[in-house]
């Protein structure tokens, strides 16, 4: 079995400047942090040649073309695997404004790369996730979610026309503990999809 976990995120400042229409003309910058809530992807080989996908629904298909989940289908086009049992586990519900779709994408690509025996390069992983969501699926979203999900930690991310730069922000442990004590995440019960905006 191979697995990969990818964090959700909280964005502090700069959201929207990671959109292509903005950073290609100016430059985008965000301060964002990964949180200790995750998307987990676990992959097992099994005897059947079918693909068994277990997320909020279950799919059993004999061809990648028959996959209904749009993100999984697009990602699997890049791999020649068959006979896999792929399990998706999320600590929090999707559409909560915490970058869950990008965390899902990063986690699946990371798990598949590990299953192939490849070492994970964080920048390549983030770029691959951006290519899937933004270029292939044409989702009108930015790049910060994929990059913070791949890199983790507290980061200052700079978006330029042809490149992305990720700088880790180092803060004393004491200050991080005090900050964590002063914030709360509350489930409002209101969910939305970023691709509808």
Predicted regions and their residues:
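Anion-binding (especially nucleotide phosphate/pyrophosphate-binding) glycine-rich loop
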Residues: 3, 35-132
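ATP-dependent small-molecule kinase catalytic core of the GHMP/sugar-kinase superfamily
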Residues: 2-4, 9-28, 42, 50-51, ...
């Amino acid at each position: 079995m191979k697995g990969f976990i990818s964090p959700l995120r909280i964005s502090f400042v700069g959201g929207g400047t990671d959109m292509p229409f903005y950073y290609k003309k100016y430059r985008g910058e965000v301060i964002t942090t990964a949180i200790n809530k995750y998307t987990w992807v676990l992959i097992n080989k099994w005897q059947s040649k079918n693909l068994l996908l277990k997320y909020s629904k279950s799919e059993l298909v004999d061809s990648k073309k028959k996959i209904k989940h749009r993100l999984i289908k697009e990602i699997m086009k890049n791999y020649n695997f068959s006979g896999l049992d792929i399990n998706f586990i999320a600590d929090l519900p999707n559409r909560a404004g915490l970058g869950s779709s990008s965390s899902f994408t990063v986690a699946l690509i990371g798990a598949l790369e590990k299953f192939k025996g490849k070492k994970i390069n964080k920048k390549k992983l983030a770029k691959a996730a951006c290519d899937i969501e933004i270029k292939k699926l044409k989702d009108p979203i930015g790049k910060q979610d994929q990059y913070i999900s791949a890199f983790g930690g507290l980061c200052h991310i700079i978006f330029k026309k042809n490149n992305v730069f990720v700088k880790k922000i180092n803060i004393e442990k004491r200050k991080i503990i005090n900050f964590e004590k002063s914030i709360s995440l509350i489930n409002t019960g209101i969910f939305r999809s970023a691709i509808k905006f």
